[in-house]
Structures are given as C-alpha cells and as structure tokens.
C-alpha cells in the first residue's frame, strides 16, 4: 500500500491514540519531580511548550494544576481545546513556537515540561538556547522544567526502529518510526514515521519525514552551560522511575532532565 505524505501533527486523533497510554505515568513522574525538586506547596501553574493534542494539559488540570500550553500546529490545538471542553476543564492554550513564545499576560509558572524529544525539533543552537531562556524567564524562582529527549549514538551505522500499537473506539493505529544514523557535523538525524490506521474495515497509511537536532551527553551539558538561569537538579530516563536518578554521562541513550530555576 503506498503511503500518503502527510504531517502526522495534522492528524491529532491518530497521534493521540498512540501516545495517550503513557499520560498518567508521565503526570505521576512530573508531580514526583515537583515534590522532590520544586518549592513546597500544593499544585500551582504548569506550562507545556509544544503541548500537542493536550493529553498532559488535561491530565494536569484534572490533578488540580492551573494548566497552560502552546503548540505550533493549529490542528493539534483545535483537538486539545475540544478534549478540554468535553471534559469540562479549562486551560490557557495558544499557538506559538518554542524558540520565540510569549506567554499571554504576566503569568509565571511553578512547573514546565516538554517530553518525548520535542525539543529536538529546534534545529539550531540559537533556537535551543532561546527556548531554554524563555522557559526560565516564565518560571518562578525554584520552579522546575522537566525536559525529555533521546540522546544520539553517533557511532551507530544502521537505522534505529521503534514500533507502537494502540486502539481506541474501533480505530487501530500502528506507528513505525525509523531514525537514520546522525550526521555529526550538521548535528542532524533524519526521521520517518509511518502511521497505519485501520477503522471499519478500511486501512490507510501515511508517512511523515523530518530532521531532529542531535545531542550527546557532552553536547547537552554544553547547551545547559549557556543558560545559567537553569541548574541541572536531576536526570532520569524514559522509564519515569522517580526513585532511580541517573548521571548525564553518556551511559544511557535517553535523558529526562530536571532543570531548576535559580
């Protein structure tokens, strides 16, 4: 079956079906990091840059947080607003970019988060630094930014493959993501995702291609040194085990950083 070329962010329901299963676990981890590394107190204000389908915006709102988020994709934001309305929950949502966002009004946040490698869409060092500085500028002193991304194995010579399968309401989605070996000079890696969607006896295949910026542990440390407003308080991985901190030393290929606002 030939694949239709389409941005998977323009199909938010299918995207959400794949990733929503991890939402409660991610929210549990965010709250655990808040308790361990943030200021004491009840849930406050939380910001999600690149909030996508709004799954974590809704989950955090349900847990008593005053939630806000932005995304660059209008289809994702429309989906997020719809799910919040259906749940009878409210949140501040707006369209913006990670490297240049501005929060409406003068809101300041206790917690911010950006998981599942979305940060790697920022393809230049300047944009990455700008994003971190802007997040720092809207965090209250002592607030935390939880940032998750896959690190790059520069010596790898073959493509990497990940596969997810999920179903909701009679819609069955299989997601296959392939990442090609990185170009260490350009610090880019090519990525392709294929979504196979089956519903009511019909099947559809769509494909999205893009590039990510690459990071080794050393490159990530160098980036963080350019934003002294944020201090690395802890490092974990995508198991989201709050009781198992790790070192950001290249010994593992995913990193969930807890950055504390000075």
Descriptions of predicted regions:
Residues 86-100:
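Conserved SAM-binding strand-loop segment of SAM-dependent methyltransferases
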Residues 129-141:
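A short glycine-rich, Lys/Arg-flanked "PGG" loop and its adjoining helix->strand segment in the class I
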Residues 149-222:
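SAM-dependent methyltransferase
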Residues 103-111:
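A short acidic, Gly/Pro-enriched loop at the edge of an enzyme's catalytic core
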Residues 53-65:
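Conserved SAM-binding loop of SAM-dependent methyltransferases across substrates and taxa
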Residues 142-149:
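Conserved beta-strand signature within the Rossmann-like core of class I S-adenosyl-L-methionine
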Residues 73-75:
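Conserved SAM/SAH-binding beta-strand->alpha-helix loop
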Residues 1-44:
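Conserved class I S-adenosyl-L-methionine
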């Amino acid at each position: 079956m030939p694949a239709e070329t389409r941005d998977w962010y323009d199909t938010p329901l299918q995207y959400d079906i794949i990733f929503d299963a991890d939402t409660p676990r991610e929210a549990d981890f965010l709250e655990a990091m808040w308790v361990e590394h943030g200021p004491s107190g009840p849930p406050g204000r939380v910001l999600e840059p690149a909030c996508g389908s709004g799954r974590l915006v809704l989950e955090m709102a349900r847990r008593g947080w005053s939630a806000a988020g932005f995304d660059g994709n209008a289809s994702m934001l429309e989906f997020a607003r719809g799910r919040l309305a259906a749940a009878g929950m409210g949140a501040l949502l707006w369209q913006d970019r990670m490297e240049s966002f501005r929060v409406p009004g003068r809101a300041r946040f206790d917690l911010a988060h950006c998981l599942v490698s979305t940060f790697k869409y920022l393809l230049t060092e300047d944009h990455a630094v700008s994003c971190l500085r802007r997040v720092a500028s809207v965090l209250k002193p002592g607030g935390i930014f939880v940032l998750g991304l896959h690190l790059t194995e520069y010596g790898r010579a073959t493509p990497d493959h990940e596969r997810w399968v999920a179903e909701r309401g009679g819609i069955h989605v299989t997601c296959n993501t392939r990442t090609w070996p990185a170009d260490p000079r350009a610090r880019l890696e090519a990525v392709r995702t294929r979504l196979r969607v089956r519903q009511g006896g019909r099947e559809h295949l769509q494909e999205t291609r893009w590039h990510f910026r690459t990071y080794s542990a050393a490159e990530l440390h160098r980036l963080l040194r350019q934003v002294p407003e944020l201090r690395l308080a802890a490092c974990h991985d995508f198991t989201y085990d709050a009781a198992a901190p790790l070192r950001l030393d290249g010994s593992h290929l995913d990193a969930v950083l807890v950055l504390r606002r000075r």
